[in-house]
């Protein structure tokens, strides 16, 4: 792999994906492991490949990603966000393809905090009339 790369960060919930894009042939490594090993579920693999498929650049770049925090779904969406932003670093003209489908938008929804006197953020404790 060459030393020339484009870097971008993707986030979702508490997951952070640091993405490096190298010119290459389409291999994706996440935390040093192949995509298929790190995310065995096909649906998550599809989510990660979406920006590359949408821009028709699936076999043009090698991607190395360090991802931490969150769960598997949050991590997959953070990786998608990171790849989209890295592609934008390479070619700003891709914005017109990536922006309308929402790949560049940071999903800012976070877990709502638990309130005292309640069982969860909004759920009440079960009430027994008798």
UniProtKB/Swiss-Prot annotation:
Keywords (A to Z) from UniProt: Ribonucleoprotein, Ribosomal protein
Q: Name one GO cellular component term.
A: small ribosomal subunit
On whether Flavoprotein is a keyword of this UniProt record, the answer is no
Give the matching InterPro entries: Ribosomal_Su5_D2-typ_SF, Ribosomal_uS9, Ribosomal_uS9_bac/plastid, Ribosomal_uS9_CS, Ribsml_uS5_D2-typ_fold_subgr
In its keyword annotation, does this UniProt entry include Methyltransferase? no
Coiled-coil stretches noted in the UniProt entry, renumbered to this chain: none
Q: Which PANTHER family match?
A: RIBOSOMAL PROTEIN S9, SMALL RIBOSOMAL SUBUNIT PROTEIN US9M
Protein name as annotated: Small ribosomal subunit protein uS9
Gene designation: rpsI
């Amino acid at each position: 792999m060459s030393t020339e790369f484009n870097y971008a960060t993707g986030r979702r919930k508490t997951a952070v994906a640091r993405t490096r894009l190298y010119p290459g042939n389409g291999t994706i490594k996440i935390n040093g492991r192949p995509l298929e090993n790190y995310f065995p579920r096909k649906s998550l693999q599809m989510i990660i490949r979406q920006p590359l498929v949408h821009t028709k650049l699936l076999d043009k770049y090698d991607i190395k990603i360090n991802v931490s925090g969150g769960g598997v779904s949050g991590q997959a969406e953070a990786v998608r966000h990171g790849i989209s932003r890295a592609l934008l670093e390479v070619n700003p003209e891709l914005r017109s393809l990536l922006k309308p489908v929402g790949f560049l938008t940071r999903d800012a929804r976070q877990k709502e905090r638990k309130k005292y006197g309640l069982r969860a953020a909004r759920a009440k404790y079960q009430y027994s009339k008798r």
